[in-house]
Structure formats: structure tokens, C-alpha cells
Amino acid sequence: MAFTPKIITCLIVLTIYMASPTESTIQCGTVTSTLAQCLTYLTNSGPLPSQCCVGVKSLYQLAQTTPDRKQVCECLKLAGKEIKGLNTDLVAALPTTCGVSIPYPISFSTNCDSISTAV
């Protein structure tokens, strides 16, 4: 069977489509462990530890694709339901406090499906 240019083009497009990331590689355990140093601060139990901002910046670098950002959002919402005593104002301001600019609000009511990588 001879491969025509049309078949080769279709195979290339199919290969690219299959190789493109459509699912997140970030697990909720990674999100919570990365931000664990922030817990005392976010519950009004202490000052902002420098390691908290290291975690925020690390998580920002990890979540570069739309599926990853959506997953981080869902993980944060889930954690927010489980952790009692969180100061929602401190949670919302945490990226800015740590010098990270993200194009969507941090809130437990954020629609994670609306998050993208567009700035």
C-alpha cells in the first residue's frame, strides 16, 4: 500500500493531536504538599513563612497548561472545604502577596472550567 501525501498529512495531524496534553499531570497531593507551609498564615495562626511563597511560585511554574490550572483550582477548592478556619481574604491575596500574577481570582466559588492559560 502506497502512502499518499493526503494519508501522510492525516497521520501527522493525528500524531500531533494524540501527543497534545489534554489532561492534567498535577495531583491534589502535590498541590496541598506544595502549599502546606502556608497553612498557619492562611488560618491567622502565624506570619507568612518564606517557604509558603516558594511553594506558591513552584505551583505556578508547575501549572502551565489549561488542564493543569483547572486541576489546581479544583484541588484548592477541595482543600478549602476540608480545612477549617481559612481566612478567605488571605487565600485570595496569597498569589499577589507572594509576587505571582495570575489572570483569575482565587476563591472557593471560582468556576474552574473558566480558567485558561490566556493572560
UniProtKB/Swiss-Prot annotation:
Domain of life: Eukaryota
Coiled coil: none
Cystines in this chain: C28-C75, C38-C52, C53-C98, C73-C112
Endpoints of the signal sequence: 1-24
GO BP annotations, alphabetical order: lipid transport
A GO molecular-function annotation: lipid binding
Cross-referenced InterPro entries: Bifun_inhib/LTP/seed_sf, Bifunc_inhib/LTP/seed_store, Plant_nsLTP
Claim: Ribonucleoprotein is one of the keywords in the record: no
Keyword entries, A-Z: Disulfide bond, Lipid-binding, Signal, Transport
GO CC terms: plant-type cell wall
Family: Belongs to the plant LTP family.
Function statement: Plant non-specific lipid-transfer proteins transfer phospholipids as well as galactolipids across membranes. May play a role in wax or cutin deposition in the cell walls of expanding epidermal cells and certain secretory tissues.
Protein name: Non-specific lipid-transfer protein 12
Organism of provenance: Arabidopsis thaliana (Mouse-ear cress)
